Amino acid sequence: MARYFPVQKTTMIKPEEVERKWYVVDASGKVLGRLATRIAKILMGKHKPNYTPHVDTGDYVIVVNADKVVLTGKKLDQKVYYWHSGYPGGLKSLTARQMLEKHPERLIWLAVKRMLPKNRKGRKMLKRLKVYASPEHPHQAQKPEPIEL
């Protein structure tokens, strides 16, 4: 005996149908990892009901006051960021405290970068992240919405 099961179609958004918004996030007093996960979700577009895995549906995120971000525990002195210059003996390192003093934007940028996909789509998403150490940013013309994370 055949039964009728209604078929529901999953909506798949096309790249040209994506509407992007601008959001501004104040990082002062926020924990780095928790802030970075929420920013990564917005960049990927997972906060939207029409999220489609194979299409980049994310929005733009402006982070201000990056120098006032908080790290819990002893991470300021124990967490070390490494990179290599490409030359023999060129391993460089900075602790999180030194990074926060010298390059506070890079601290948030790296945390978000490592949470995004490691492919072309992830690199494209990362270009929509704008991080500033001060409360001012040059994106007022885009009329960004303040968002509380």
UniProtKB/Swiss-Prot annotation:
Superkingdom of this protein's organism: Bacteria
SUPFAM superfamilies listed in its UniProt record: Ribosomal protein L13
Record keywords: Ribonucleoprotein, Ribosomal protein
Keyword Ribonucleoprotein: yes
GO MF entry, a single one: mRNA binding
GO cellular component: cytosolic large ribosomal subunit; ribosome
GO biological process: negative regulation of translation; translation
InterPro entries: Ribosomal_uL13 (IPR005822), Ribosomal_uL13_bac-type (IPR005823), Ribosomal_uL13_CS (IPR023563), Ribosomal_uL13_sf (IPR036899)
Keyword DNA damage recorded: no
UniProt record similarity statement: Belongs to the universal ribosomal protein uL13 family.
PANTHER family: LARGE RIBOSOMAL SUBUNIT PROTEIN UL13M (PTHR11545:SF2), RIBOSOMAL PROTEIN L13 (PTHR11545)
Subunit structure: Part of the 50S ribosomal subunit.
Known role: This protein is one of the early assembly proteins of the 50S ribosomal subunit, although it is not seen to bind rRNA by itself. It is important during the early stages of 50S assembly.
Name recorded for this polypeptide: Large ribosomal subunit protein uL13
Protein source organism: Thermotoga maritima (strain ATCC 43589 / DSM 3109 / JCM 10099 / NBRC 100826 / MSB8)
